[in-house]
Amino acid sequence: MSIWGKIFGGTSGFVLGGPLGGLLGIFAGHAIDKFNRKKLPESIAVKQVNFTIGIIALSAKMAKADGIVSHQELDAFKKGLIINQNELKNVEKVWNFAKQSVHGFESYARQLAKLFKPNSSILENLIHLLFSIAISDGKITVEETEFLKKVSDIFGFDKKKFNLLIEIYSNNENDPYTILQSNINDPIDQINKKRITLLKRHHPDVLIAKGQPLEFVEKNNHYVKTVSYTHLTLP
């Protein structure tokens, strides 16, 4: 069953708690547990559902960060997920509810951070989607930068990693050295090792095993393709 069937069909068979559970509960009729600060359930199903609702919520609030939600930002979000046509209205309902205000995004981010390791490839992929939404209408605004920095901090990424993402999406998305976190004078063998490491870190099988839904893995592979193609643009 697709992730959408698990979420909107009410067949997941578990209680989804916390802020994300509250968001899902606005229409799904699930029982919602009071959120506590203990470690959340670690089953893959729970991670997938939390991750998917978290994507919708954070993407909507990302788009709202500068006060204006553009059609480019909505399109960028839709490009990041495989959404069944019959579930599109449900997804839009969560999106529209979350985008009413930028406030509260930290609670969604913290709940996701409890499910995955700090600086994990899954959280990194989510950050990539948020960056792609931010830049989709031409530039990353000051408000969007502040939003992204706060989410990045909650997810456990250091300042160096955040600055790298800013550099990639603002200026050098096609620069192989920036993407591979290398310098032009680095030995080619060293650069190739970094490429292989990044590809292994973001391999679809690895991401799915950690709890990332297939519907996200299959669509949100722009970064992986970018890393793969760097060998074509290196001297």
Describe each model-derived feature in a short phrase.
Residues 1-229:
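Small-residue-enriched hydrophobic alpha-helices in membranes
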